[in-house]
């Protein structure tokens, strides 16, 4: 539960900020 979320959050943030992942 915890590990998948940690890997998904950074990707979601860079997409929302329109930054290169």
From Swiss-Prot:
Cellular component GO terms, alphabetical: extracellular region
Tissue: Expressed by the skin glands.
Disulfide bonds: 14-21
Subcellular location: Secreted
GO BP field: antibiotic metabolic process; defense response to Gram-negative bacterium; defense response to Gram-positive bacterium
Keyword Transmembrane listed: no
Key words, A-Z: Amphibian defense peptide, Antibiotic, Antimicrobial, Disulfide bond, Secreted
Key word Secreted present: yes
Primary role: Antibacterial activity against the Gram-negative bacterium E.coli and the Gram-positive bacterium S.aureus.
Protein name: Japonicin-2
Species name: Rana japonica
